[in-house]
Amino acid sequence: MLNEFPIFDYEDIQLIPNKCVIKSRAEADTSVTLGNHTFKLPVVPANMQTILDENVAEQLAKGGYFYIMHRFDEAGRIPFIKRMHDQGLIASISVGVKDYEYDFVRQLKTDAPEYITIDIAHGHADSVISMIQHIKKELPDTFVIAGNVGTPEAVRELENAGADATKVGIGPGKVCITKVKTGFGTGGWQLAALRWCAKAARKPIIADGGIRTHGDIAKSIRFGASMVMIGSLFAGHIESPGKTIEVDGEQFKEYYGSASQYQKGAYKNVEGKRILLPAKGHLQDTLTEMEQDLQSAISYAGGRQVADLKHVDYVIVKNSIWNGDASH
């Protein structure tokens, strides 16, 4: 039962260092394998319209990073798969659960993507289970990620239906207001929810939402994630598709949630909002910094690879990690 677990989030946790066994952090291996492919980092940019478009997806794939293309350009998905496969790159797309998506999956038989993510806000649903089974029947070699969920029961059901990985996180993201609009979700206790779900999982978990710092990646791995999906830290780059807006001479980029009126084009069942982020530099600079910070984390863990983060001790420091420094 959940009540047996302490409830905490990222800022409440500090990992405890172990003796370092490598000469330099550059020796630490940050790569991770998901399905049949190995990627440079256990990190994937959120499959949102203001985070990536086809060009960003291509850049990530060429660089050896995992990506998941969003599902908001439905007609463009088959040409996108072809574009990636023509260059010898992996194709990784998203689908919903509406009736027409069943026909779409059948159309993929001639050129199946390596990864499909079933992407809906409340993934513990009969509609998701049915879509997992459909994809597994039509495209048995495609790796299926299903979500989003927030309970061990949901993880078990989606895995039993055939999902190869589950995505955990209901509304902890910076531009998600599910917790406010509905009263439900993992906002404020996402890391504890991840831990709770990971104890039931037999297959990989992707932690999705609530990541505010690079250290949160290491914490996610510690509490059971194989991969970490990140939105806001990947938004606002030069390559990011979001609109650039100037305010008082400063450049900002827009970042909005996948269930916002900005993405939907209509104010109906809205569970996302829009924010402006100060424009950042190049995406590759952030990826490089993430890799270096994760290498440092592995060295603090006394390890050589990502999996070594899973065994470190931790302490719960209720909201004191920033010592009153709210700038973070």
UniProtKB/Swiss-Prot annotation:
Active-site residues annotated for this sequence: C176
The UniProt record lists the keyword Secreted: no
Stored Gene3D superfamilies: Aldolase class I
GO molecular function: GMP reductase activity
Catalytic reaction equation(s): IMP + NH4(+) + NADP(+) = GMP + NADPH + 2 H(+)
GO annotation, cellular component aspect: cytosol; GMP reductase complex
Keywords, ordered alphabetically: NADP, Oxidoreductase
Any single GO BP term: purine nucleotide metabolic process
Family: Belongs to the IMPDH/GMPR family. GuaC type 2 subfamily.
Protein name: GMP reductase
Organism: Streptococcus pneumoniae (strain Hungary19A-6)
Lineage: Bacteria, Bacillati, Bacillota, Bacilli, Lactobacillales
